[in-house]
Amino acid sequence: MSWQAYVDEHLMCDIDGQGQQLAASAIVGHDGSVWAQSSSFPQLKPEEITGIMKDFDEPGHLAPTGLHLGGTKYMVIQGEAGAVIRGKKGSGGITIKKTGQALVFGIYEEPVTPGQCNMVVERLGDYLAEQGL
C-alpha cells in the first residue's frame, strides 16, 4: 500500500459513518520529508518539525511557545510523553503520533471531536509502529 493510500484510506476516512473526517492529515519522516498528505495539509516549515521532534525528546518543550504548524499556532494540551503531542486551537486541534520513522498528523475541526482525531491518528500510528515503521 502506498503512503498516499494510508492517508486517503486510514486518516481521511469516514470517522463515524456520518461522513465526518479530519480536516487535514499527513505522514512525515522524522527529518521533515513529507511521505504523503491530504490536499488540505499545510506547508511545513523546517523549524516546526525541529520543534515537534524536540518536544518528543524533551516533553514540555513546546508548552511555553505553543505548537506551530504551517504558521498556525496550537496550544499544547496533555499528550503522551515521547509518543503523542496534542494541540488545541479554537474548536479544532491537532494530534501527532510518533512512530519509529514517521510522524502521523491529524488536524480536525468541529464537528469532529478531539477523541475521534486521537483514535484515527493513534490507530494508524500504532499499526505503523507494529510494522517497524
From Swiss-Prot:
Span of the annotated motif Involved in PIP2 interaction: 83-99
Changes after translation: Phosphorylated by MAP kinases.
PROSITE patterns in the record: PROFILIN
Modified residues (Phosphothreonine): 113
CDD domains per UniProt: PROF
Pfam families: Profilin
Name of the featured protein: Profilin-2
Complexes and interactors: Occurs in many kinds of cells as a complex with monomeric actin in a 1:1 ratio.
Sorted UniProt keywords: Actin-binding, Allergen, Cytoplasm, Cytoskeleton, Disulfide bond, Phosphoprotein
GO molecular function ontology, one term from the record: actin monomer binding
The keyword Hydrolase is annotated on this UniProt entry: no
Lineage, uppermost ranks: Eukaryota, Viridiplantae, Streptophyta, Embryophyta, Tracheophyta
Membership in a protein family: Belongs to the profilin family.
Source species of the chain: Corylus avellana (European hazel)
Additional detail: The variability of the residues taking part of IgE-binding epitopes might be responsible of the difference in cross-reactivity among olive pollen cultivars, and between distantly related pollen species, leading to a variable range of allergy reactions among atopic patients.
Chain's role: Binds to actin and affects the structure of the cytoskeleton. At high concentrations, profilin prevents the polymerization of actin, whereas it enhances it at low concentrations.
Keyword Disulfide bond: yes
GO cellular component terms, semicolon-separated: cell cortex; cytoskeleton
Disulfide bonds listed in the record: 13-117
Principal subcellular localisation of the protein: cytoplasm
